[in-house]
């Protein structure tokens, strides 16, 4: 499969030509990103989203897993959910991710983020988490991919990219948008507890500002 998706790049961006002016370039990229968000929402299963929200709210601990560009998406998710006062972690090192996964239990949740759904480190880390008893949520662009076979809940994005270019911005925009929806839904359902967490964490960094 890896050989099939690795093809020589023939352009900097699929929809942009070398003759495009800056204003046209701006409009094309903006339209593409807006289309990505719209298509992701159309693809999103409300039932899967509600189940993911309930799992996260009731979890003792949540671990976000991802490598490469998706690893930084996982770190962003960690920051968001920490603000709510939840026990959350994410790490860029694949070995530490594996160790964290085997230490999860039945009341914990693992969230695997992989645009292609075929990233070996992320898939295997999610498999370790599942074998340890944790529930697994995956965020991916491909419904038929290895990561969905180990996930209890699948949340799909709709970025128009090849797996080779999973570091491009449209895939990250889709992932961040989906995580923002998930975060907000969790916060609303937590109600006062979420507000307490937000106020507590805001005070913790208040003296970091001039």
What spans do the regions from the language model cover?
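A short, charged, Gly/Pro-tolerant segment at domain boundaries
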Residues: 192-210
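Glycine-rich phosphate-binding loops that contact phosphosugars or nucleotide phosphates
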Residues: 57-177, 181-191
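A ubiquitous structural signal for well-ordered alpha-helices
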Residues: 33-36, 40, 52-55, 125
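Glycine-rich phosphate/diphosphate-binding loops that line cofactor/substrate pockets in enzymes
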Residues: 47-59
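HTH-adjacent hinge/linker in prokaryotic transcriptional regulators
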Residues: 1-47
């Amino acid at each position: 499969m890896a050989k099939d998706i690795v093809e020589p790049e023939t352009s900097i961006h699929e929809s942009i030509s070398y003759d495009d002016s800056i204003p046209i370039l701006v409009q094309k990229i903006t339209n593409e990103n807006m289309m990505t968000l719209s298509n992701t929402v159309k693809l999103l299963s409300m039932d899967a989203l509600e189940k993911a929200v309930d799992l996260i709210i009731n979890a003792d601990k949540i671990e976000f897993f991802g490598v490469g560009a998706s690893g930084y998406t996982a770190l962003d998710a960690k920051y968001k959910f920490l603000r709510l006062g939840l026990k959350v972690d994410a790490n860029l090192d694949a070995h530490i991710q594996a160790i964290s996964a085997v230490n999860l239990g039945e009341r914990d949740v693992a969230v695997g983020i992989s645009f292609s759904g075929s990233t070996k480190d992320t898939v295997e880390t999610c498999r370790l988490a599942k074998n340890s008893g944790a529930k697994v949520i995956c965020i991916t662009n491909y419904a038929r991919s290895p990561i969905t076979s180990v996930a209890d809940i699948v949340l799909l994005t709709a970025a128009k990219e090849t797996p080779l270019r999973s570091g491009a911005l449209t895939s990250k925009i889709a992932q961040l948008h989906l995580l923002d929806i998930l975060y907000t839904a969790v916060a609303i359902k937590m109600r006062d507890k979420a507000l307490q967490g937000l106020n507590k964490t805001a005070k913790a960094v208040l003296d970091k500002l001039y």
